[in-house]
Structures are given as structure tokens and as C-alpha cells.
Amino acid sequence: MTKHKLTTNAGAPVPDNQNAMTAGPRGPMLLQDVWFLEKLAHFDREVIPERRMHAKGSGAYGTFTVTHDITSYTKAALFSKIGKKTDLFVRFSTVAGERGAADAERDIRGFAIKFYTEQGNWDLVGNNTPVFFLRDPLKFPDLNHAVKRDPRTNMRSAKNNWDFWTSLPEALHQVTVVMSDRGIPASYRHMHGFGSHTFSFISPDNQRYWVKFHLRTQQGIKNLTDAEAEAIVARDRESHQRDLYDSIERGDFPRWTMYVQVMPEKDAEKLPYHPFDLTKVWFHKDCPLIEVGVLELNRNPENYFAEVEQAAFNPANVVPGISFSPDKMLQGRLFSYGDAHRYRLGVNHHLIPVNAARCPVHSYHRDGAMRVDGNHGSTLAYEPNSYGEWQEQPDFAEPPLAIRGDAAHWNFREDDADYYDQPGRLFRLMTPQQQDELFQNTARAMGDAPEEIKRRHVGNCAKADPAYGAGVARALGLKM
């Protein structure tokens, strides 16, 4: 028998949790039944706004262990020596679906990592694909609206989805990945992760390197066909979450090997493709993979809402030695993610335990809704001042970044219009069976989209490789 007795939020004993207070056994309820009022008022507010994207997620705690030396590229403390361990929290997710969506749907998967370092939290907010649909964040709300529910029917719309994707030819690379055999991972454990964006390393001698992060699963890649996924969804909508949770509970801890691709700052100008374009990858022949360490997940959360639903990842959270790049999608996310968290969780979401830094924090910010720490007590609230409080730290300033050009709404399609080379290369890397799966998956996904949209997609595919376009056309039953 538990010794935990029921109380109100104020700590008073609850004498009856079975019957509301009424005037007589059949009379009306009384307003003075404060336990009923408290219980129902809390119930009415239990649901917080869901994430606009990545709403359905699963999480786990673990560690990152350095296995190889990269200190010549970065002064970040978590990479400072071989054998160093850093605690972390990971949230996996589907992207387009709501909180109640099935895990085994054809979709990108989110792969967000919060490293609790001694220099602050570093959030690597990535996906299971190395590229994305867009390279300009101004179109991100449009992507969201295209893949979410139609405002009239409240149903997902292949017409809306494919009309948008095919109208942006730069999306073809990501579309090819999502429609391939890797579009439905068998589980979160059996997929790779990518930082996707170009970030930067700052070295001990204050030199800048451009960097991309890769996480390769040690469990091996496993995927589902459409038919296999449909059978799983019919019996278990939480298949990915169940697989992750159960594997950790039985001690079968999933692991990923971290690699980086590194490029000296000046070399970015020499590449034949745009190094800060999120719709493109860096070729391994140009920037080979460099092994860094191992990520292991070994502890499940105790409370899903507190630790997974309230987790807030923000690519703006970096530490000394890791920074940003001119990648426009990354720069757009630097604002959008924090802003979304302030709406969803409140301005003090950084105080929620799963989000809280584990190093000393001496932030300038105070007050605001749900401030639950000491709010800096009587410490003065302005800077500069005469008392040495809130001192800035110029030793951690980054080297200057050279930029050039006039301010304007530049059409990047005039700067780099090659959207087809890399999707074509990816297509030609596939086996004939994988290519056929790509054709058939695309045809099923396009569903009842109008023929003009289907023909537009076939045209985009043909520019990547004539065989790609011809195969999709055959699967769609189109005569070209």
C-alpha cells in the first residue's frame, strides 16, 4: 500500500476523490467544492500547443564518447580529449504528422540531440536525411501548409503536397530520398542522422572551418516497404517509440558513430556547388568523413510529458568552438525555433529540467511567466555597471566572417540553378530494384494529384536522369 496520500496543489488533504459535493444525495453541486474546481480546471489545461512540425516524438538519455582527436579543428570542450563523455538527450520524431500520427509513415524523421556540456548546452537539431526541400527559410511556412491538412477538407492532400514540391525544383533531391526505400525506416534505431546544415568549427588558434555532422547507426540500416508499413500501422501506431523504449529497457542500447566533414573557410569558394545550400550534400571525395565518437542511448525518460513533450531544441544553442554559417535555412531556424518554444512552453522554457544547462548559468534575463528559480535575487538588473556584474567574455569572440554583396531579395535560382545533378547521382547509385521501388513509391504517394502535377514531376525527374523520369512516368501510367 502506498504511503502517498492525495492532496490539493496547495498541500491540503483531499477527503473524497470519488464524489462531488452536492446539496443532498440528488441535489445540485456546490461552488465550494474546491477540489472539484481545481481538478477540472487543471484537466481543462493539460494539453499544451503541439509542435507545428515534428509533433510526434520519442526520446531517451545517453552519452557521447570521444574516440578520435579533432582538436585541431575545434576548441569545443566536449571534443577536448579521447575518452571524454558528455551526457545528452535525444528526441526522434516524424515531421509532417500530428501527435497522433503513426510512426511508420513515409516521412522525414527528426534526430535532435541536446549535449549537456560544461560550456553550456549544444543542440544539434537534425534529421535522418542530409538534405532538405528548401534552401530559403521564407518558404518554410508554405512547406508546412502544403504537407499539413487542407484548410477546406481538413484532410492531407496529395494535390497540395506535390503541387508545392514540383513547383520548387530544388526540392527534388529531398523528394528522391523520401520516396526511396529509405523513406520509411524500420525504427529510429535503424536510421542514420545528419546535422544537414553547414555549421562551423572554431579552432584553438581561432581559425574557422566549415563542418557537416553525420551520425551513422551501428544497428545497420533497415527500412519498410509501403505494404510492410501499412501492416504495422494497422496494429501499432507507436511502432518506432515501442521499439526504442523496449530496446533500452532490455539493455540493448542503440549506438551511432559520429563523423564530420571539414572544409577550411577559404575552400568554400572553390567548390563547383554551393557549400551552404541545404538541398545539396558535400561529396565525400571533396570532404572525407572524419570519425569523432560514439553516441549511445541507455536510459528511458520517467515521464513523457515532462521530458519529451517539454524538450526544446534550438540550433541557436551552440558552445565555444561550434558556430553557424551563411546557410540561409540555418539562419532562419536560429530565430524560428526559439520563438516557437517561447510560444509553446513560455519564455522561461530553459528552466524546465530537460532543457536546463548543467553548467553554471549567469544569464541577464529575469522575470516572465513561470519563472521558477530565484530570479537572480537582488542582483542588479543592468549593464554596464560599477560592480563587475554581468561581465561580457570577449575571449570567446569568433573570428570575423567576410561577407560581400548588396542587400536585396536575391533570386538564388539565378545564382545556382543546378538542382538536378545531385538527385541524378543519387538515382544512379541505386540498384535496379531500388530504382523500381522509387518509381512505385512515388506513384502511390502522388495518388489522385492532377495529371499536370504528375507531368511536372516527371519532367523534373527526367532532368536529373532520363531513366528516372521514364520510370516514374511508367509507374504513373503516363505516356510522355
Curated annotation (Swiss-Prot):
Cofactor(s) the record lists: heme
Spans annotated as Disordered: 1-23
GO cellular component labels: cytoplasm
Active site (UniProt): H54, N127
Keywords annotated in UniProt: Heme, Hydrogen peroxide, Iron, Metal-binding, Oxidoreductase, Peroxidase
Binding positions for heme per the UniProt entry: Y337
Entry GO MF terms: catalase activity; heme binding; metal ion binding
Classification via SMART domains: Catalase
Keyword Oxidoreductase: yes
BP GO terms, sorted: hydrogen peroxide catabolic process; response to hydrogen peroxide
Reactions accelerated catalytically: 2 H2O2 = O2 + 2 H2O
EC numbers: 1.11.1.6
Described purpose of this protein according to its UniProt entry: Decomposes hydrogen peroxide into water and oxygen; serves to protect cells from the toxic effects of hydrogen peroxide.
Similarity section: Belongs to the catalase family.
Protein name: Catalase
Naturally occurring in which organism (per UniProt): Nitratidesulfovibrio vulgaris (strain DSM 19637 / Miyazaki F)
Taxonomy of the source species: Bacteria, Pseudomonadati, Thermodesulfobacteriota, Desulfovibrionia, Desulfovibrionales
